[in-house]
Structures are given as structure tokens and as C-alpha cells.
Amino acid sequence: GSGCAGSRFLNGTLDIHIELEEKLADLVGKEACLAYPTGYQANLGCISAIVGRGEYIVIDKYDHASIIDGCLLSDGTMLRYNHNDMKSLEKCLIRADGKPALIVVDGIFSMEGDIANLPEISELAERYGANLMVDEAHSLGVLGKRGAGAAEHFGLTEKTDFIMGTFSKTLASVGGFIAADEPLIHYLKHKSRALIFSASL
């Protein structure tokens, strides 16, 4: 067969998984990467693992359903701002009142096809001490000099804490990934239930 018949946490990690993750991390300009069975699970697994009780997730109203479901699975409070409206985003960040917050946004929005205003989103994230996650599902292979997505397109890879991607669009396959700094990926390996309790890619 073609499956590993086990979780990545147990017997489901092969050399080809590690090689794939290294290549994906290099593509999007991050230290490390974690491959999930699907892009949907990547969003669920990342968001629900890193946002805890008393913390906030701030999302665009047009964000993908997998982002919304990840928020609902977390212990955090979800705040939604009007589509690509920076004043509305800032109001949400003010409402978070200095508590830990994660902004999650599509690089390219799946229904409208427009691009997120990442320069201003990143600036607001920095101003209010929020972390930033960009879903590159529809921008991977489309934006950026190397096709790495919206974060690369705007020169904001270093200021983007988490980059999510899927294999089901430009790459015409099945799977998804989260790329970030090594300590964050190490944390997800041990806390992301969508990874731990699912058979590997």
C-alpha cells in the first residue's frame, strides 16, 4: 500500500516526510515545517493547538471555513473583522486589550480572489503585539518571486509567524503543511491533535 498505517507521532514518520518538510520550509523561507494529511487539518491542528483560554484569534470575515473551524476548536475567543478592512481589524485588536492574539488571514481569498492587505495587517500585528498566520492555500505558486505566496510577495516572510499551505491547489496533490520557526513546529508536533491522532500523509 501507499500509506504509513500510523500517526506521525508513532510509526508514521518516514525519511521522505522529513525531506518533504525540509523542502517546503526552504520554499516558504521558514526554519521548519510540519506536513499534515490535508490543508484543512493543517489549519485545524495549528490554530487549535496554539491559542489557549483567555487568548484571541482575529480573522477576516472571508477567511476559509477551516480557519473558522480551527478557531471553534481552540479555547480562545474568535473576533471577526470586516473583509480587508484595517479599521475593523484594529478595533478587534483594541478589544483584545493587550492579551495574546493571533491574526489569521488568507493570502488570496478563495471566494473573491482578492489579495489580503498584508503590509497593513503585519503593521497592526506588530503595533499590538499580535502573532500573524497566513493561509497560502490559494497564493502558493501564484504570488511571490519563487511562488512562495503572499508573505513572500510583500516581503513579509520574517514577520509572518506561521505560514500554512496546501498541496491540493497549485501542487495538484493531497496534503497540507504549517511552516514556522523550529520551536513552534516542535510545539505543534507534541500538541496538534489533528496531527497526533491522524494517520500520516
For each feature predicted by the language model, list its residue ranges.
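Conserved PLP-anchoring active-site segment centered on the Schiff-base-forming lysine
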Residues: 46-65
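Active-site-proximal loop->helix
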Residues: 49, 65-75, 79
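Conserved Walker B
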Residues: 62, 108, 137-138
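Active-site phosphate-binding strand-loop segment of PLP-dependent enzymes
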Residues: 79-134
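Active-site PLP attachment segment
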Residues: 152-187
